[in-house]
């Protein structure tokens, strides 16, 4: 099937069910890899080193927000066929944005050093994350087409390989006392491999083009969609960046360590469902009864898993920290874990509803 060809409702439903199963499996694999690595790194790294790790990724995520004006989401959400002109316009605009942002990131290096007290090693890690942002933007179109067509069997492979390479290299090099440089090496290698693998799985010939009309049509949905996500970026990564300058890397290490564990139920239960339901809901826009049923089922499924998982996590966190000697240093983060847990419960209800409104084009409501 051509990348721009529309698919029927029956195909959408079948691929959506398979997609949820595939992405749930992907999430399970990724979280197992991430958990194993995070557990090992929690014992090997100091809170300050962990803080540098989180702050660097927060900087990268903040820049990544401005590298996207919602064009990929607009391609997924669009009713009807997607044209090659729209694909190439999206590709061209995004590459231009990323190059400008990378230049700003380099210019802002003295600010990162003074505000966070970063060493040269930490700065090199941030630059490596900037390079990974470029590699990620280069694979946006084939990834978007796989997602639009609900071909999640292919879609998940580069993500799993990326995570496996990154965490394996990170843990190995940290164990060998490479410190923060471990992450610099790991992120470059993993992002390059995932870029090449994406184009192997979904060949698409990159090209430079610009259509004002195509860009305008996509921005009608994409820009409000991206503005809508700014609250999430400001709440998570923005807050990390502000608090990092006030509390220092060690203080932010405690807070974000707690948040990562508290958000774990969302990553397992909610993320795979939302990833599939966004394009699926978009394809169901003309069938209200099917759409309503799908929304209700997705919320019920997510809440039935997230609610008990969060409560259980808060209860057992203290005893686990007491049991593992190398984790005693994370005891100050237990209060933050409980507080963030309540936010996780609310997100299990509100995020699927926001996803539904976005998928059906009611972006101004959200």
Predicted regions and their residues:
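Alpha-helical transmembrane segments of polytopic membrane transporters and translocases
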Residues: 47-67, 132, 239-241, 253-270, ...
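Signature of the first transmembrane helix
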Residues: 12-69, 97-98, 102-110, 128, ...
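Helix-terminus/linker motif at the lipid-water interface of multi-pass membrane proteins
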Residues: 35-49, 113-116, 172-174, 233-264, ...
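Interhelical loop/hinge segments that connect adjacent transmembrane helices in multipass membrane
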Residues: 1-12, 16, 153, 196-237, ...
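Membrane-interface junctions at transmembrane-helix termini in multi-pass inner-membrane proteins
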Residues: 13, 17, 80-83, 134-159, ...
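Hydrophobic alpha-helical transmembrane segments
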Residues: 123-130, 157-204, 217-221, 228, ...
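Interfacial segments at transmembrane-helix termini and the short loops linking adjacent helices
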Residues: 111-129, 313-345
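Helix-loop junctions and terminal segments of transmembrane helices
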Residues: 66-83, 147-148, 258, 262-306, ...
């Amino acid at each position: 099937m051509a990348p721009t060809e529309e698919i029927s409702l029956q195909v959408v439903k079948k691929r959506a069910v398979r997609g949820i199963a595939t992405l749930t499996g992907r999430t399970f694999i990724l979280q197992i890899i991430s958990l194993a690595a995070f557990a090992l790194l929690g014992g090997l790294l100091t809170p300050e080193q962990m803080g540098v790790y989180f702050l660097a990724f927060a900087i990268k995520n903040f820049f990544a927000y401005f590298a996207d004006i919602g064009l990929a989401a607009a391609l997924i959400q669009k009713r009807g066929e997607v044209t090659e002109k729209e694909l190439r316009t999206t590709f061209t605009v995004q590459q231009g944005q990323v190059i400008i942002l990378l230049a700003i990131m380099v210019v802002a290096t003295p600010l990162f050093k003074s505000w966070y007290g970063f060493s040269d090693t930490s700065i090199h890690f941030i630059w490596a994350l900037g390079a990974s942002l470029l590699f990620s933007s280069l694979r946006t179109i084939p990834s978007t087409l796989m997602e639009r067509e609900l071909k999640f069997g292919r879609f998940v492979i580069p993500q799993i390989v990326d995570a496996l390479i990154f965490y394996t290299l990170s843990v190995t090099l940290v164990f060998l006392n490479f410190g923060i440089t471990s992450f610099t090496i790991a992120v470059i290698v993993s992002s390059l491999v995932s870029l090449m693998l994406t184009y192997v799985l979904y060949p698409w010939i990159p090209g430079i083009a610009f259509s004002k009309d195509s860009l305008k049509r996509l921005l009608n949905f994409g820009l409000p969609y991206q503005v809508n996500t700014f609250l999430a970026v400001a709440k998570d990564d923005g807050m990390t960046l502000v608090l990092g300058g006030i509390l220092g890397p060690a203080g932010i290490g405690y807070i974000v360590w707690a948040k990562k564990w508290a958000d774990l139920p969302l990553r397992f239960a909610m993320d795979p469902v939302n990833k599939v339901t966004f394009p699926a809901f978009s394809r169901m826009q003309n069938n209200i009864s099917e759409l309503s049923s799908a929304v209700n089922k997705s919320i019920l499924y997510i809440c039935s898993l997230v609610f008990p998982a969060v409560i259980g996590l808060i209860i057992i966190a203290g005893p686990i920290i007491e049991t593992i000697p190398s984790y005693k240093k994370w005891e100050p983060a237990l209060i933050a874990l409980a507080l963030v847990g309540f936010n996780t419960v609310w997100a299990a209800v509100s995020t699927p509803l926001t996803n539904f409104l976005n998928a059906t084009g009611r972006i101004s409501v959200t």
